[in-house]
């Protein structure tokens, strides 16, 4: 079995970090890298003590100021990839500094990294257990639900700090933006987009002192994480809005040109202008959705055919539903169309995600 580097980012860690590192060493995990992410001066003694523990290859990488967990991980990944004996390692396992990840579970992930050289390994907790703090249970349930809704992926523990990174995929994660806790969320999204496999491994769920040692800011970091999670849908809205504006402008310009230079009148010129404008705006919308919203890099012809099939079905559904609702209610056609098309707009997002731009 190859070596594994245990990476522990730490900010003002508890003293039990010393015993935790000793336990890792006692269980054969000899290569350990700690990142002191700008801890206060009174915590320096803890890092110095850990660095002097015998019978291991322990290094402490220090930040002059707190740069965030995302930056700590990226700097450590970069250090790992520059090791002269990199070929001796199967990869990296990250663990939290508060000791909430059992040594047995760290070993479990190390083995999974060895056996799955092209997958991200997640050590996943059970949030239905009684010992889980309510705020942690609620936060993870919401985040996991958002991933299922907006990405069509079921990740049971999106915020786990116990992760395994095979050497072959680590370089990819250096390009991901994010300096704090949102970086770990972006990792998962990146894996979805680049079709990097994710394997979940069940680990023991441990919380000390109601998770009071965490440096996770429930307001600031939650906002960043949810902003990242909702990013594709927000881009989808922006794509649709810009395409709508282009459709109106194209219709106006084409209509003016046909009236000025063509011998066409009445409904015919409106129909032709509408068709040409819709071809322009829908092509633009397809490009934006493929390139920026869903970041789909596979068969363009196949996805284009699916996209226009969806457009036709969506148009027919709109006409049928508006007609039916109008027939049996007293509401105006325009008001009904706004409601119906808004619902179809939301439905279209999920159809595009799960069918038009579905990854293998």
PLM feature spans:
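Cell-envelope/extracellular polymer assembly enzymes that use nucleotide-activated donors
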Residues: 3-5, 31, 186
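A conserved acidic beta->alpha catalytic loop
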Residues: 36-47, 65, 99
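Active-site donor/metal-binding and catalytic loop motifs
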Residues: 199-217, 295
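Conserved donor nucleotide-binding strand/loop of the catalytic core
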Residues: 47-87, 91
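Catalytic donor-sugar/metal-binding loop of nucleotide-sugar-dependent glycosyltransferases
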Residues: 154, 176-179, 188-206
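Acceptor/aglycone-binding surface of glycosyltransferases and processive sugar-polymer synthases
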Residues: 65, 71-80, 89, 103-181, ...
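Short, well-formed alpha-helical segments that are part of the catalytic scaffolds
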Residues: 12-26
């Amino acid at each position: 079995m190859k070596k594994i580097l245990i990476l522990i980012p730490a900010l003002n860690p508890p003293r039990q970090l010393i015993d935790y590192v000793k336990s890792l060493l006692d269980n054969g995990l000899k290569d350990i890298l700690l990142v002191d992410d700008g801890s206060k001066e009174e915590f320096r003694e803890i890092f110095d003590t850990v660095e002097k523990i015998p019978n291991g290859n322990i290094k402490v990488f220090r930040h002059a100021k707190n740069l965030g967990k995302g930056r700590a991980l990226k700097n450590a990944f970069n250090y790992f990839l520059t090791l002269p004996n990199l070929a001796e390692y199967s990869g990296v396992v990250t663990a939290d500094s508060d000791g909430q990840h059992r040594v047995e579970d760290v070993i479990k992930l190390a083995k999974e990294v060895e056996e799955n050289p092209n997958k991200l390994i997640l050590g996943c907790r059970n949030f239905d257990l009684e010992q889980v703090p309510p705020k942690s249970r609620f936060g993870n349930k919401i985040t996991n639900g958002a991933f299922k809704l907006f990405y069509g992926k079921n990740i049971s523990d999106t915020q786990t700090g116990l992760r395994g990174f095979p050497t072959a995929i680590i370089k990819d994660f250096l390009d991901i933006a994010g300096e704090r806790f949102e970086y770990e969320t972006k990792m998962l999204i990146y894996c979805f987009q680049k079709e990097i496999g994710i394997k979940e491994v069940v680990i023991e769920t441990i919380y000390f002192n109601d998770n009071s040692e965490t440096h996770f800011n429930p307001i600031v970091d939650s906002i960043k994480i949810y902003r990242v999670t909702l990013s594709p849908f927000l881009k989808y809205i922006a794509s649709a809005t810009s395409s709508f504006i282009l459709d109106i402008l194209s219709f106006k310009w084409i209509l003016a040109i046909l009236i000025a230079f063509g011998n066409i009148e009445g409904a015919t010129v409106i129909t032709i202008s509408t068709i040409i404008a819709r071809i322009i705006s829908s092509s633009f919308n397809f490009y934006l959705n493929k390139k920026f919203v869903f970041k789909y890099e596979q068969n363009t012809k196949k996805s284009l055919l699916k996209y226009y099939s969806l457009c036709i079905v969506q148009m027919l559904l709109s006409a049928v539903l508006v007609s039916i609702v109008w027939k049996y209610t007293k509401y105006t056609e325009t008001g009904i169309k706004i409601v119906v098309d808004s619902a179809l707009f939301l439905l279209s997002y999920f159809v595009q995600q799960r069918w038009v731009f579905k990854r293998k």
